[in-house]
Amino acid sequence: MAIELLYDADADLSLIQGRKVAIVGYGSQGHAHSQNLRDSGVEVVIGLREGSKSAEKAKEAGFEVKTTAEAAAWADVIMLLAPDTSQAEIFTNDIEPNLNAGDALLFGHGLNIHFDLIKPADDIIVGMVAPKGPGHLVRRQFVDGKGVPCLIAVDQDPTGTAQALTLSYAAAIGGARAGVIPTTFEAETVTDLFGEQAVLCGGTEELVKVGFEVLTEAGYEPEMAYFEVLHELKLIVDLMFEGGISNMNYSVSDTAEFGGYLSGPRVIDADTKSRMKDILTDIQDGTFTKRLIANVENGNTELEGLRASYNNHPIEETGAKLRDLMSWVKVDARAETA
């Protein structure tokens, strides 16, 4: 079934322009949403916890900063862009007591709604606007007169206006310039988590790490292994990003293409696909989310242990030394997402 694409001509920008919007969180997405909304003629305030380091950044950008509770009381549209694992607490303590019938609670990701970690009253509009790109790209494309495609979804629609309101919001941040795709909270949540775990983060990270180990354990220099399994990965991903897998295969050498066809299925085989299906099941039935919440309730001990183990892998030390030789690589790429 073909997806439905909506554009600026399908959106009524006046719907969001007639609302007071609180952006809760001023990170990668928060700064982009708030600035794009303001440039589209929407009244915006920023809601942050007391003592937040982001408050000064928001003020420097010209925004009024309130506590999250104050922002929720002031607004009739609240976009919750805080980290997934803190959203339920923020909702319970600061947002829920300040909601009125007909207010809209929006999300950039569906996890907390889909898995019932947040349960707004029935008279509250619940929707999602999820740009398919990082915040700095959402902002840069908007300034350039373009946009980043967005997903929108509706979970509760007591007024019959939720779809139009989420589309209006998406248009105000530039999404309808590129195309807005209506979906569901379930589809966005499950596919997003699966992509992160099985392919983008978990799968790719393990593939790179194990490839490095195979080469170094066979006696090859760590620097050579790093270049071949990690450094050149960007070239391949960029080619796929720009024109698909066929474009990548067209662009590499015949030797690389032929070897890839032969060896790829030996690495990612039917057993791998079966385990990926198991990962999908764990996401769908809530197993992963329960473990995520348990980790938070236990002070992030499991996450911190995993993080330390991965950060101490030999590929990290090798990579740090080699990146110092590359003037075109940012000294601290993490600053981009801070």
Swiss-Prot record:
According to its UniProt record, the EC number is 1.1.1.86
The role this protein plays is:
Involved in the biosynthesis of branched-chain amino acids (BCAA). Catalyzes an alkyl-migration followed by a ketol-acid reduction of (S)-2-acetolactate (S2AL) to yield (R)-2,3-dihydroxy-isovalerate. In the isomerase reaction, S2AL is rearranged via a Mg-dependent methyl migration to produce 3-hydroxy-3-methyl-2-ketobutyrate (HMKB). In the reductase reaction, this 2-ketoacid undergoes a metal-dependent reduction by NADPH to yield (R)-2,3-dihydroxy-isovalerate.
Provide this UniProt record's keywords sorted from A to Z: Amino-acid biosynthesis, Branched-chain amino acid biosynthesis, Magnesium, Metal-binding, NADP, Oxidoreductase
- Top-level EC class, please? oxidoreductase
Q: Active site located where?
A: 109
Cofactor binding, per record: Binds 2 magnesium ions per subunit.
Q: The KARI N-terminal Rossmann domain covers which part of the protein?
A: 3-183
List the pathway annotation. Answer: Amino-acid biosynthesis; L-isoleucine biosynthesis; L-isoleucine from 2-oxobutanoate: step 2/4; Amino-acid biosynthesis; L-valine biosynthesis; L-valine from pyruvate: step 2/4
The GO cellular component terms are: cytosol
State whether keyword Metal-binding applies: yes
Q: Which cofactor does it need?
A: Mg(2+)
> Could you give a single Gene Ontology term from the biological process aspect?
L-valine biosynthetic process
PROSITE patterns for the chain: KARI_C (PS51851), KARI_N (PS51850)
Q: Any idea what this protein is called?
A: Ketol-acid reductoisomerase (NADP(+))
In this chain, Mg(2+) 1 is annotated as bound at 192, 196
Query: For this protein, what is any one GO molecular function term?
Result: NADP binding
Q: Please, which domain of life does this record's source organism belong to?
A: Bacteria
Q: Does the keyword Magnesium apply?
A: yes
List the catalysed reactions.
(2R)-2,3-dihydroxy-3-methylbutanoate + NADP(+) = (2S)-2-acetolactate + NADPH + H(+); (2R,3R)-2,3-dihydroxy-3-methylpentanoate + NADP(+) = (S)-2-ethyl-2-hydroxy-3-oxobutanoate + NADPH + H(+)
In what residue span(s) does the KARI C-terminal knotted domain sit?
184-329
Q: What family, per the record? A: Belongs to the ketol-acid reductoisomerase family.
HAMAP family linked = IlvC
Q: Which residues bind NADP(+)?
A: 26-29, 49, 52, 54, 84-87, 135
Q: Which Pfam families match?
A: KARI_C, KARI_N
